[in-house]
């Protein structure tokens, strides 16, 4: 029964999504809303949502890393990554946890270093 509940929760999470304001806030925090091949983190991140090569690989989205310069593709990558590493936050639309995982990796929601980042995204979501 517990396994069934977990499967149902995962299925629900796959169909839920954070509000549009989350995507706008993430874009603004990462690159001030700019588009294109923006390099960040000393060349380690790319595109409007500042995705690293490791993040892209972890997302398991097909295509090439260079495609993250396109905002629509970058959103697909972030969506897949967050659904993989923060499915409950995704289903609940928990923008703070989602932002912290985006910023700090799979354990980002537990890292003190991501608290301010999460708060900044949350402020912009309002």
For each predicted feature, which ranges?
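Catalytic glycan-binding domains that act on GlcNAc-containing polysaccharides
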Residues: 17-126
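Positively charged n-region of N-terminal signal peptides that target proteins for export
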Residues: 1-3
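Hydrophobic h-region of N-terminal signal peptides that target proteins for export
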Residues: 6-16
